[in-house]
């Protein structure tokens, strides 16, 4: 029917509870999935989930190589849940601010384990385009939503949904968008509700650095390393491949003036240099 004898990625769909995850382990279903992979009918195994706790288990399984996961600035504030309806509630808890730690952990574990993320729900069902329905009280554009998703650690691609040709054009505009048009950071940093103050989102507003540091990448490696009791060897080696290290920071604080989230970058560079030893 598909006029092919193999599929690149075979998907295990909609595993949203830890109980469901445990049920499929060592099951006839999983035996079938592994058999398909052994026969080269599927080349890679993927899984979809809306729950970061389940997705983390998949990323650490050793056999799931790709995760289809819901990512946008609004959903990233939400704590782990088995109930997908919580994502589409009309009102968010007023205490929610910044990226939920479990979701941030997922993105970093995926990057560390070389598990790619394909994004779904990048527009939050269109809510982020309407300031009255957005939890931030401001609207974002499709280009800004796409850029947010693609700048999360481990994200490889995003799937967008369309009803009209104009909506397709709005998404394709990302290919030719300027940095200013992609800029989601200024919008959510200054939003009247649920701002991301104090959190590095790797947006790149800190550039350029007078010491030529890739600040966003250094921050990403620091976040990856501090997830573990000891710095993983792979993270250490990737950090050491950077042309300029955190120890070269001259603490001029020029980057901090540009950071829309008020991150204390010079302080983070000092901590990073101590952590990695350079």
Protein language model annotation of sequence segments:
Residues 240-254, 266, 278:
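Iron-sulfur-cluster electron-transfer modules
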């Amino acid at each position: 029917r598909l006029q092919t004898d193999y599929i690149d990625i075979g998907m295990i769909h909609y595993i949203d509870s830890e109980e469901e995850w445990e049920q499929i382990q060592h099951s006839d279903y999983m035996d079938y999935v592994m058999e398909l992979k052994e026969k080269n009918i599927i080349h890679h195994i993927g899984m979809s989930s809306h729950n970061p706790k389940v997705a983390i288990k998949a990323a650490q399984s050793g056999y799931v190589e790709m995760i289809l996961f819901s990512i946008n600035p609004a959903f990233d504030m939400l704590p782990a849940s088995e109930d997908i309806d919580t994502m589409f509630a009309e009102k968010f808890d007023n205490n929610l601010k910044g990226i939920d730690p479990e979701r941030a952990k997922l993105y970093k574990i995926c990057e560390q384990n070389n598990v790619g993320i394909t994004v779904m729900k990048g527009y939050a069902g269109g809510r982020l385009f309407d300031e009255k329905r957005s939890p931030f009280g401001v609207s974002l554009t499709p280009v800004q939503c796409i850029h947010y998703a693609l700048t999360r650690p481990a994200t490889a691609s995003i799937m967008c949904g369309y009803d009209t040709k104009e909506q397709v054009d709005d998404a394709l505009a990302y290919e030719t968008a300027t940095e200013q048009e992609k800029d989601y950071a200024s919008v959510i940093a200054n939003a009247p509700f649920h701002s991301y103050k104090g959190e590095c989102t790797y947006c790149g507003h800190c550039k350029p650095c007078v010491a030529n540091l890739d600040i966003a990448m250094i921050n990403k490696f620091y976040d990856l390393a501090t997830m573990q009791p000891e710095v993983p060897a792979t993270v250490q080696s990737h950090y050491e491949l950077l042309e300029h290290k955190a120890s070269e920071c001259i603490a001029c604080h020029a980057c901090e003036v540009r950071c829309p989230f008020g991150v204390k970058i010079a302080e983070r560079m000092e901590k990073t240099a101590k952590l990695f030893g350079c």
